[in-house]
């Protein structure tokens, strides 16, 4: 029972938390050439992730863990997962690989799928498009092609709808990352923009029939009040937080642009100056002016700033904007509904 | 031998004392003669004393001695140096060596040195321990000596075969040498002693010295005592001393080398020593005399008199007895004395005394005021010259003398209006005695006084400001002022406008920083009785300093042609106005002068004065309750963090490394004397308090505004420092008080704020320093109330729907009209979104403050704006075209920017409000 729900959603209908699979895949998200077209997540995994966050995650802290499962045809089935321990200052020498291997071995002993198919991470107001995520997802995907990252947003979930999304890097970005060249030229050549960095894979949450039956029954029994959190009209806090974060990113973006601008100016200035100087010297010596190519050899141009960060920031800004758009749209819907209700009552 | 010459010259110089001779004799006539003779003589003594061989050999032995010493302390570098010298010396002595054969001791040192070096060379351990220089020297020296010794191989081998013998021989030889030399010495000494004795007996008998006869004993005594002095100080005769010492060393060296002195020799040596000593003493004496002689020749004979100064004091011996003292003679004398001026080795103190003596003589002989004035000028000049170094200051007694002298000079000048004094009067056109015509004397009283002022400043700079001594010195200030006043009066009558301007400036500089308590008092007590009595009173107490400043400055404004004097005068005038709380006059003058625009071109002292003036202006504004003006005036000085340096009240340690000694000296000279200082704590407090009064309401008004700018960085810095404190105790320092007060004010708690700003501690530290402390305090309280009210309204207006003005007036203890006016002003300035409800006397708030989200959205929009702009710039760059399409668009964007401002936003909102 996997229901797809669009963001602008009529909130009243999809009240059940288990039913609210957050597969908001956009059309462009799924790429044709990848073997995996869909991610099927076991209910167990979802519950484990939620539990993990509730027990260990607080505020801006994120929790992470490993996804286990297997690939069936064009479908990635995630059947189990286990958490990573929280990093603390004390156990700096904690060996993650060792831990993973041992966990997987142990799980194999109890007959659980032990194929490593990705990892999951919680997020704080959707701020997950970071360098760290990119790097680790790259290494995962480099090793296991099918692997995805599940992003779990506890705050949105707390508002009444489960937010769980599966992402993976686009093949383009994989290539760029493989070459590790983030100079403006390389990115330009790869024709990569923030939109084509991550692709979202549609997810389906799968439960056993027995559980589904239980769900229906529970839903019938649950009081109306339990579902009311979805109807909360209080929006300012969430919106404010999102705006704040968005603003921070915009600031970073600005700085990045300024940096880039300076770089451009410096390069052109240097080129002009050096060229002129060199040519003047050559002229005085009676030699022909230098051709352009020699120049770049003679004088080291300033180090171009890596553009990956600004790409990531742009991606992050995009996510925030999506979030805000979604949120405001929902809230407007709620407001109109409330208004209509009031008029009706009057 | 030298004795003889000395005696001769002595008597001659003595004879020249008689004056008659001198008058007729051209001063420069005997200039070069005697010193020349003397120097020849000196050389002679040396050449005659020792034969060339002895001299050379002594040189060698000396060097060898040092080498041996160096060997002992393993200083190979020294060895190398000395060895090179030795080689040179040996080369010089070549001719003698050719005659006499290679001296044994020379061979010995060569052999020893080589052995020593080889030994060192073998000693690997020791070599390792050696420092780099030594090791290097060792290898070079070893190579050199090997090479060098090749020439002496045969000698060295023979020496090595029989070292004992050669050593003995050596000793013998040395003995012989020293004997010979000592003999010669003896001879010479005998002669010199004889001549000395002769001189003693002869000198008084010289006819030119007749007049000294009575004083002979005394003279001798004084000479002796001076001898001792010379022994101690050795400053004048240091040259001769060192030479002497060298001689002594060589003599001693030859003696030390004696291995087994016979008793005979022993005696001789002892005898010689004694003689040596005697000789040395004589020598020194003669040297000194010689020097004096030289000086005499250079600058007139007076130096010789030094020995007899006490004597001269009792009985003026400037001129020979019976000489008719005329103008010509005195002036001649004066010129002679003056010629010694500035020369090395001239005893300046004695020169001054001599000049004073001359004045006395002139006065006694009624030579007329002209001459006296002339001499007085020179005395003062000499007093100024007393210190050769510009940085050092006059000794108190000198300073006293100087003041007296200037006073006397002024007395004379006032008493004799027919004396013309001027810089531009040439020496030739001076008229010192012709009573028929007005007397004309060269010299500038103004320069003297200016110099005096400088000296005074220097004395004050160099005195510890917290000592009693400083107070003592400060007492002289009155005298200095009095002199300046006198000179001013004098110049007003006689001087040119330029001179008057200069003296006026001097007067101004001594007036502007003083608070006129009398005038202040007069102002405070309003006219009670009739205007007439008040007038009398005013006359009695003299001119108000304000009136005085006005008069002097106006004269300078009108007459002065040099920019500097006018600038200084304006600044002082402003300072004076500011000091006496005439804010508007001060400000207008400052603005009219346009000094703010071009003060950076002025020289540092004027800039310091400018800074002082600005600070005073700021403090004045503060006293008037004009916090904004105060803040602006003080901003430049305070924001730099170098107020101390900018006001010339001390050097910063931080920049000490950046400047070298020279610069530091210059800067030290620029320092303002302590009694002119502006209290830095007061300054900072005034600045911080005015910043607080401005900044806190501003902060409250723009709490959520991203574009908020700091008014005062320094104030914010202090706030941050206060916040960083882990544990906040009760405030101790002035800054802590202000920070604590600011915090209270932020909450609109004016009572706490008040208690932090005005309390016992702050009174003692700051507020009591103002002349009208109570007035300032009342002003301050009122300001605090007003600004607290504003802050309160800014901060808490959002929680009120309406608020009664009466409540506000109770809360802030302000009367209703004031509250009304403050609120009205805020409403007009769109700082407070509210309206006044007249009948109920309440302020009704309009809920138009943007919510948190709206604020955030506004900020975001702004940030995005700048982002777009930056982005376009990148694009521009890519395009390579500045301007064009995107430029236009950018402008368009900027035009739209207005909507982000609060006012614009409100308009929009009010349109869309529902």
Curated annotation (Swiss-Prot), chain B:
Q: Which GO terms describe its molecular function?
A: RNA binding; translation initiation factor activity; translation initiation factor binding
| Ranges of compositional bias, category Acidic residues | 166-190, 217-232, 291-300
Q: Please state where this protein is localized.
A: Cytoplasm
Recorded hits in InterPro entries, A to Z, give:
EIF3C, EIF3C_N_dom, PCI_dom, WH-like_DNA-bd_sf, WH_DNA-bd_sf
Q: Where on the chain is Phosphoserine found, per UniProt?
A: 9, 11, 13, 15-16, 18, 39, 166, 178, 181-182, 910
Instruction: Show the ranges annotated as biased composition (Basic and acidic residues).
Output: 199-216, 261-278, 887-900
Fill in the subunit field for this protein.
Answer: Component of the eukaryotic translation initiation factor 3 (eIF-3) complex, which is composed of 13 subunits: EIF3A, EIF3B, EIF3C, EIF3D, EIF3E, EIF3F, EIF3G, EIF3H, EIF3I, EIF3J, EIF3K, EIF3L and EIF3M. The eIF-3 complex appears to include 3 stable modules: module A is composed of EIF3A, EIF3B, EIF3G and EIF3I; module B is composed of EIF3F, EIF3H, and EIF3M; and module C is composed of EIF3C, EIF3D, EIF3E, EIF3K and EIF3L. EIF3C of module C binds EIF3B of module A and EIF3H of module B, thereby linking the three modules. EIF3J is a labile subunit that binds to the eIF-3 complex via EIF3B.
Q: Which family does it belong to?
A: Belongs to the eIF-3 subunit C family.
Q: What is this protein called?
A: Eukaryotic translation initiation factor 3 subunit C-like protein
From what organism does this protein derive? Homo sapiens
Give the organism's phylogenetic lineage.
Eukaryota, Metazoa, Chordata, Craniata, Vertebrata
Chain's gene name: EIF3CL
